[in-house]
Amino acid sequence: MKQVEIIGYSRANLGKKGSKDLRLDSNVPCVLYGGESQLHFHVPMFLFRDIIYTGVACTVLLNLEGKQYKCVVQEVQFHPINEMLLHVDFLLLDDKKQVKMNIPVKFEGTSPGVIKGGKLVQKVATLQVKAFPKDLPDVILADISQLELAKSVKVGDIKTNNYTILNAKSIPVCTVTIPRSLKQEEAAAAKK
């Protein structure tokens, strides 16, 4: 799993006003959970570019005023209108404890249904996984090489390696839909 290093700075003002002032200075208020006590800090907003806005999951090496913590992003809060990053929660990793994390889904292979004119529709962007930190994948690969028209790949169809997917097995990850034009062609052929 990819590891990204970011630098954080402790913060004393924990209220609404302190958080608002940090955001005005292009900083994001953050909290690190999982240790003996919670650590409140802030990180410059541009440092989250390599963590949140990528298509792969990663661990974070947090440098907090000289001390280093290995952690993962647990929760991210965005502003509902302008989608500005408001708050980030980190979870401290322990090699002896399993951790839950949302991992992005990618597709491998070429679907015969897409070749026949269908459209591949992704239903789920991430899946929740439980694993030891060393076994966390960057992405979850879903094989679509056998996916025909009007069929779907479900969570239960995905092969896992040293991790458990916590989502329900019956949830579709992707589906090959039949476009309207293809349905009309089939209906016209059936009438003849």
Curated annotation (Swiss-Prot):
InterPro entries: Rbsml_bL25/Gln-tRNA_synth_N, Ribosomal_bL25/Gln-tRNA_synth, Ribosomal_bL25_b-dom, Ribosomal_bL25_C, Ribosomal_bL25_long, Ribosomal_L25_dom, Ribosomal_uL5_bac-type. One of its GO terms (biological process) is translation. Gene3D superfamilies: Ribosomal protein L25, beta domain, Ribosomal Protein L25, Chain P. Signal peptide: none annotated. Keywords: Ribonucleoprotein, Ribosomal protein, RNA-binding, rRNA-binding. One of its GO terms (cellular component) is cytosolic large ribosomal subunit. Pfam families: Ribosomal_L25p, Ribosomal_TL5_C. One of its GO terms (molecular function) is 5S rRNA binding. It comes from the Bacteria. Part of the 50S ribosomal subunit; part of the 5S rRNA/L5/L18/L25 subcomplex. Contacts the 5S rRNA. Binds to the 5S rRNA independently of L5 and L18. Belongs to the bacterial ribosomal protein bL25 family. CTC subfamily. This is one of the proteins that binds to the 5S RNA in the ribosome where it forms part of the central protuberance. This is Large ribosomal subunit protein bL25. It comes from Cytophaga hutchinsonii (strain ATCC 33406 / DSM 1761 / CIP 103989 / NBRC 15051 / NCIMB 9469 / D465). The gene is rplY.
